[in-house]
Amino acid sequence: MPNYDLPGVEALREMAADDSGSIFAPKSELDDFRQVFLDRELSWLAFDHRVMLEAAERRLPLYERLRFLAIWASNLDEFYMVRVGGLVDRDQLQPFKADIVSGLTPRERLEAIGRRTSVQLKSAEKLYAQITAAMRGAGVEILQADLTDPVDAALCRQQFEVIRPLLTAQVVPAGKPLPFLRNKEQAVIAILSGGKRAELGLVPIARLPKYTAFHVNDTIKILPTAELVLRFAEEFFPDREVEEARLLRVTRNAEINMQDLMAGCEADVRAVMERVLRRRRRLQPVRAQLYPDASKRLQKRVAVGLQLPPERVFVSTFPSDPGFVYAMEGEIPDEMKRTITAPAKNVALQKGDYFSYLARHDLLIALPYQRIDPFVDLLYEAADHPQVESIHITLYRLAGSSRIAAALSYAAQQGKRVVCVLELRARFDEQNNIDYSRMLEAAGCEVIYGLTDYKVHTKLCLIARRLPQGIAYYTQVGTGNYNESTAEQYTDLMLLTTDPAIGRDAAKVFRALSQGETVPETETLWVAPEGYRSRVCEMIERETAAGADGYIAIKVNSMNDPEVMRRLIAASRAGVEVRLYVRGICCLKPGVEGYTENVHIRSIIGQYLEHERIFVFGRGERRRVFIGSGDLLLRNTRRRVEAFAEVRDGVIQAQLLHILQSMERDNCKAWVLNANGSYARVTPGSAAPYRSQAALHDYFAAQKIEKPKPPQPVQKQTAAPQPVQAPPPPPKKLPWWKRFWNWLMGK
């Protein structure tokens, strides 16, 4: 039997109370709202489906359409690794316990997921065939194992001889489990005959380039390495007859309970995380993919060999590993790719200008429409400024070659105190963060690994500068990671401010994190886990009390917190206009009579990944606007450290409102959630097409930030000086006898 690392019962119980709501919770008033709630997992799959359908947009360049298919497949990988893995664990623990939000048992959810996956695979097959046929007609051909062209065959043979020494075949006796295959690793699997019993052959394909490109006449031929190995499968088993050979890819569970492992390990958190990563590599499989087709016999052998139920062995003509799509981008002609819109260089500030500018104005950076450079420049300005004493920052996901990490290291080398709260548990970025923790420590930064029970997901940076009158705080509150790569792909916001209340709260957050504690009370920041959901609910209740005069607009990535959704239902019933912009998971149905008639929900799927979080409550003088790092998932409201700041600057408020208004106007990339739980694409009809992301790029490019003007010198007087009048002379002193006489006479 393979040594799959199965979580214990206590770990399963912890997993069972995650983002989908406490499965062990008793019945409550939430049962009354079941008809307006959607299942979290099926909502995730609905989001993936919207991403896939971008590949059907004929107005997009061909490679862009193919890339959307690859994004869909990558999302599905993560879904199975994270969500299906957790559901499998729960199904083992209490298979009949229903989810508190959707009312479905783990088994029912797994079955529904399997059906949805099969339907999406069929759509992906058709789209992939259409797109690759169109690319072939335009001069880019993706070769397959069953090619017949003699020139292509000769090229394949030549390339196979190059990689053949790097591949090793294995024979698996009948009835034995399959050898260990790494997560998302491909292998050729074959049914072999010629021995006593039918056996399986396996050729793992790992650590090889994803593809090879050939330029033949005017055609670019892309040969995926997996297709190449599949073509020559018989040559790995010369003493056997290969009855059937296909590509196999295994997806493994990535859900591992870290809380118990992290408890009491403050002395060496990094070593524990490295042990966790090694352990995760051997978790049980949750999905198998066979390409391009497979007999029932082979499907059964794979299911038995991997200890998988048959319904989680998927057969499809869509490539099981579309990683070659990303890798081959450099081979694709420009006319097949989208035009890259460069971020606007509209912030005229340079290093040395930021402190003086921020002393007078708040600054908003809207990514990717504007560059992230101003924030990097601010860090370098702080590093070189003699009055700066410290820089504190939370780090969750850093770029591969991070200029921000370099700036922090430079500041430490310049003698500044640099404190980095680095979250090692950022899923799938753990090793990257471990590497950066060593680099930052080597540069002289103080690295803190956050809290045992809560992930530190907040995006906060605090610069402390000593002035004659006291400490001045320069605070950055953001919605996205300090990551230059995603800053070009995700829509995010950075607010830079010298608001003293925000600075004091940020200092309180960092003091608490340094002491291994959460933040119970703040002046103005909303800080999860204690002060985020409660503040959101308070603001919703304020608008509920206003009735038809109330207004709520919320933009987040995902939402499934039942308490927040219950408050939104109450607001809708009170007549409050509720507009939600939820890109991904959304577990609330709008437009349900008696519940959510006044709730409207949109999702934008475009060139950039919508990622900023914006909360607006009220209109006019009652309006309050907040931005921050957290979604409205239970994991954000209960088990993470998040931070939101109120935006008081009128100009920046207007910019944030413009973002929401643009999303409301979008009639090309918007989807509307209906009362039955389905999504419908918004189309222009007779109106002019309006794409919010393109419009926002133009809008923020026009928001010029000029350098602060130097103080004007005191003007010299140019008018002629006025003559100064002499004071009147003192009165003349009288002789003594005259003064005596005046005294006698009473004068």
Regions inferred by a protein language model and the residue ranges of each:
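Hydrophobic alpha/beta core scaffold segments
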Residues: 577-581
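N-terminal localization/anchoring segments of enzymes in phospholipid and broader phosphate metabolism
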Residues: 2-552, 570, 574, 586-747
